Regions:
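C-terminal catalytic histidine-bearing segment of alpha/beta-hydrolase fold enzymes
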Residues: 279-375
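Primarily recognizes the serine-hydrolase "nucleophile elbow" in alpha/beta-hydrolase
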Residues: 152-156, 160-217
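Mobile cap/lid helix-loop segments that gate and shape the active-site cleft of serine hydrolases
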Residues: 208-256
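Bacterial N-terminal signal peptides
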Residues: 11-21
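N-terminal cap/lid segment of alpha/beta-hydrolase-fold proteins
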Residues: 31-76
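Alpha/beta-hydrolase active-site loop
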Residues: 135-157
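Short substrate-entry loop that stabilizes the transition state in hydrolases
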Residues: 80, 86-124, 207
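Short beta-strand/loop motif that positions the catalytic acidic residue
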Residues: 261, 267-269, 273
Length: 375
């Protein structure tokens, strides 16, 4: 979520309510959505000597007519072998990923793209952070958009052989659904569309997220917004549309993720996350392991010495006693950060993944800011 301190203070009790026992699971079939196979779009560059992110429009083949998704991308000066699709979180747009995309292209030689999910309500910057405001939980649309843009780059840039999808927070919901949908969107040679999925502090159980938002909505503006945005995506409340909610929960689609052919998953989550509870990462990791999908789980314990603000459960509790309290434990990072330990760990793991270090058979890692990673 965007770094807005008043919003963060309001958001922390939302996660606290979720941690205190609002998890819900339900069975579901394949996520609803079209068979996404072929995409027409505006021309994209495969190489660029200019250190910038360009705009991109992608046609998404949904019924009754195709729709356009807008986004931004950056490409290196040499032919890229890897594409990274970044899926943004709640309150963010593709603009939050400009610096990450430029770094990816310049420093790692990969093409990088982020899409503004169709249906998201985007308005000008209102808090002075230089980023537009955004409302909407358009995760199924974002999943379709992510598939469409990946297909577009593969069709245009023949040098790309590997595609990694990387989602943060709500983007974990989006990217997980994209991998599930991709079981029906494989490449022409039958290989998986997405080779790897990186799930960073991901909201992979939207039923749990909605339950927490609903509990706090009467007394919490942030929770009320989240509740309303989720209901808009689902077409009603959970009681009215339980099957739709189940269809949008990534944890209900392990079979589809397995069928997509994804080669492995990396899960990164702060132990003291105050927005998306750590239990969602544990649930996701357990299901992936049960399905024999190679998975690396990184639990972030203590923070590093970076000055980034985050949202943590202990930080919220301590802040009730001392407004200046700063928890030593890692909470929910802003996806724009290049120094918070959660984002540093996730991005470092992305680059090593691209470099050839694939996830293992259920590896567990503890990351401690002051002392390092174990084992």
């Amino acid at each position: 979520l965007k770094d807005r301190q008043p919003i963060l203070r309001l958001a922390a009790p939302l996660a606290l309510a979720m941690v205190l026992g609002m998890a819900v699971n339900a069975s579901a079939g394949t996520p609803s959505g079209p068979r996404l196979t072929e995409v027409r779009s505006s021309r994209v560059l495969c190489r660029d000597d200019v250190d910038r992110a360009r705009g991109v429009d992608v046609s998404v083949p949904v019924t009754p007519v195709s729709q356009i998704a807008h986004g931004r991308y950056a490409v290196p000066s040499t032919k890229p072998k890897t594409l990274v699709v970044f899926d943004h979180g709640y309150g963010h747009t593709s603009k939050s990923w400009v610096e990450h995309m430029k770094n990816a292209a310049r420093d790692h030689g990969v093409a990088a793209v982020a899409v503004d999910y169709r249906g998201t309500h985007i308005t000008p910057d209102a808090n002075g952070d230089g980023l537009p405001e955004a409302r909407g939980w358009r995760v199924m649309e974002g999943a379709e958009d992510s598939i469409a843009v990946a297909q577009r780059f593969l069709a245009r840039c023949k040098s790309i052989k590997q595609v990694v999808i990387f989602g943060v927070s709500m983007g974990g919901n989006t990217s997980g659904l994209a991998v599930a949908l991709a079981k029906d969107a494989k490449r022409a040679d039958g290989s998986p569309l997405f080779d790897y999925w990186v799930d960073v502090e991901g909201a992979v159980n939207v039923i749990e997220t909605y339950a927490g938002a609903s509990a706090l909505a009467p007394v919490n503006e942030f929770a009320a917004h989240a509740k309303a945005d989720i209901e808009e995506e689902m077409g009603g409340t959970f009681d009215q549309k339980p099957d739709v909610y189940a269809d949008h929960a990534v944890v209900n689609h392990i079979g589809d993720i397995k069928a997509s052919g994804v080669k492995g998953v990396v899960v990164v989550h702060g132990l003291d996350d105050g927005l998306v509870p750590y239990n969602q990462a544990r649930e996701m990791t357990g299901l992936l392991k049960e399905a024999s999908i190679p998975t690396d789980m990184y639990t972030i314990g203590r923070k590093n010495d970076a000055p980034d603000k985050d949202t943590s459960l202990t930080g919220y509790a301590g802040g009730q006693l001392d407004p200046n309290y700063n928890s030593p434990l890692a909470g929910h990072a802003s996806e724009t950060s290049q120094t918070h330990i959660v984002m540093v760990t996730a991005l470092d793991r992305l680059w090593t993944l691209i470099g050839g270090q694939a996830p293992g058979a259920g590896n567990e890692y503890i990351v401690d800011g002051p002392t390092g990673t174990y084992p």
